[in-house]
Amino acid sequence: MRARPQVCEALLFALALQTGVCYGIKWLALSKTPSALALNQTQHCKQLEGLVSAQVQLCRSNLELMHTVVHAAREVMKACRRAFADMRWNCSSIELAPNYLLDLERGTRESAFVYALSAAAISHAIARACTSGDLPGCSCGPVPGEPPGPGNRWGGCADNLSYGLLMGAKFSDAPMKVKKTGSQANKLMRLHNSEVGRQALRASLEMKCKCHGVSGSCSIRTCWKGLQELQDVAADLKTRYLSATKVVHRPMGTRKHLVPKDLDIRPVKDSELVYLQSSPDFCMKNEKVGSHGTQDRQCNKTSNGSDSCDLMCCGRGYNPYTDRVVERCHCKYHWCCYVTCRRCERTVERYVCK
């Protein structure tokens, strides 16, 4: 009996969704670049793991950027693990780059977050590197056109966000511009989420000031535009992750677009993370779906949040254990000017999931 055409189409679409989805974040493997690799010659670009040919070309033509890109990859790893430390999915699989598990291989909510964070991180790192004078191709950001406010004056060195966004997008979006990398739906999803990450970075630009005046009177303040820390951007993106929208690839007019699965009468909002495939609950270990499980994960007995023992342990229960903590105590200030402390030890009770 021959399969019906619509069944075949559905199977092909499902297969496409599972193929090559994480191609755009393989560059995070740069976090493992040996410090001994100088990255001062173009032939070094071929030795870097996780890059597509377009990124290798960008490396060769912008060699001075690569230390900053490596730094960005390392910052993504740290920021993701910190942001999800209290969740069942704790971003541990990101450290397997470039050989990800299915939690990041597929078009999941988790991959949406990592794409957004990666795009934000590389632009953030480049913008900051311009400010610190580490890149010969850029300097401080432009002086804002609006007045700084009473008692303030523009000065200092602003983070060069425009240059960071330009060069960051060229590098992080390059894999999605390659023709043979998965389905069109996946490409649209990845590009959309990367732009959401850059949007979150733009929103983090704020006025920072330094006081001047006699005896700290702060009669005049020198101000500039600076980016928040990447961890703050990650926190913003985590909020968007929690409210991410599941989408489908459907015709709208003469072209196909990503539209919300449960409300396909409107286009996807520019500010929302989107995903194509639902994730497992990450309760049990199952590498087929990219789940490490939560067995032996630490939980908080008194919390009502995602790190609570009830939620983290998925109802399986938990085991208590005692831990000895050494900390500074009985600190005393001495004139002038130092502090002495004693070292105290106390026992705390902790809990891990069964």
UniProtKB/Swiss-Prot annotation:
Glycans are attached at N40, N90, N160, N300, N304. This is Protein Wnt-11. Ligand for members of the frizzled family of seven transmembrane receptors. Probable developmental protein. May be a signaling molecule which affects the development of discrete regions of tissues. Is likely to signal over only few cell diameters. Residues 1-24 form the signal peptide. The lineage of its organism: Eukaryota, Metazoa, Chordata, Craniata, Vertebrata. GO terms for cellular component: cytoplasm; extracellular matrix; extracellular region; extracellular space. CDD domains: Wnt_Wnt11 (cd19343). Keywords: Developmental protein, Disulfide bond, Extracellular matrix, Glycoprotein, Lipoprotein, Secreted, Signal, Wnt signaling pathway. Disulfide bonds join C80-C91, C130-C138, C140-C157, C209-C223, C211-C218, C283-C314, C299-C309, C313-C353, C329-C344, C331-C341, C336-C337. GO terms for molecular function: cytokine activity; frizzled binding; protein kinase activator activity. Belongs to the Wnt family. The keyword Disulfide bond applies. It comes from Homo sapiens (Human). Palmitoleoylation is required for efficient binding to frizzled receptors. Depalmitoleoylation leads to Wnt signaling pathway inhibition. Expressed in fetal lung, kidney, adult heart, liver, skeletal muscle, and pancreas. One of its GO terms (biological process) is intracellular signal transduction. It is found in: Secreted, Extracellular space, Extracellular matrix. A lipid is attached at S215 (O-palmitoleoyl serine).
